């Protein structure tokens, strides 16, 4: 089984890698922006044209971290990575995207919000808005792409 993990230098990717690294039945393909820039459509197209992937674990992200100064590139980069990967959903069996509580707006208390309320909120920050729009698309697609939060 070939598993593509984007954002190999991030916390989530490192944790997932440590879980799968000793499995003989799993071939991990770990990427960062130097080996596969998911913001670039042509790079993603070339990657899927030349690699057989069973599972995509999309852990690459821009923003969302403490100390990160948010800017408009947060929404552009996050949405372009997601869109470029999802355009090739016919080239893999399943994709997992990592959501965030920020999808519901960081200014809200989200403990009592149900998942179906994602359509009712629009976060005020770039990172949260990007995550919200990705979640909305995943819900509307009802395909082989899933959001983990």
Regions found by a protein language model. Give the residues of each.
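NAD(P)H-binding glycine-rich loop region in Rossmannoid oxidoreductase-like domains
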Residues: 41-78, 90
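Glycine-rich NAD(P)-binding loop of the Rossmann-fold in SDR/ketoreductase-type enzymes
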Residues: 39, 70-81, 121, 125, ...
């Amino acid at each position: 089984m070939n598993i593509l993990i984007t954002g190999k230098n991030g916390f989530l990717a490192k944790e997932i890698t440590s879980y799968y690294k000793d499995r003989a039945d799993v071939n991990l393909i770990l990427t960062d922006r130097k080996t596969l820039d998911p913001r670039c459509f042509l790079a993603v197209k070339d990657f899927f044209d030349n690699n057989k992937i069973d599972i995509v674990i999309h852990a690459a992200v821009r923003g969302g971290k403490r100390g990160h100064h948010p800017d408009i590139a947060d929404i552009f980069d996050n949405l372009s990575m997601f869109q470029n990967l999802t355009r090739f959903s016919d080239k893999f069996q399943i994709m997992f995207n990592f959501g965030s509580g920020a999808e519901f707006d960081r200014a809200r208390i989200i403990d009592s919000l149900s998942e179906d309320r994602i359509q009712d909120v629009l976060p005020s920050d770039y990172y949260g808005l990007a995550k919200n729009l990705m979640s909305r698309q995943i819900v509307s697609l009802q395909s082989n792409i899933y959001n983990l939060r």
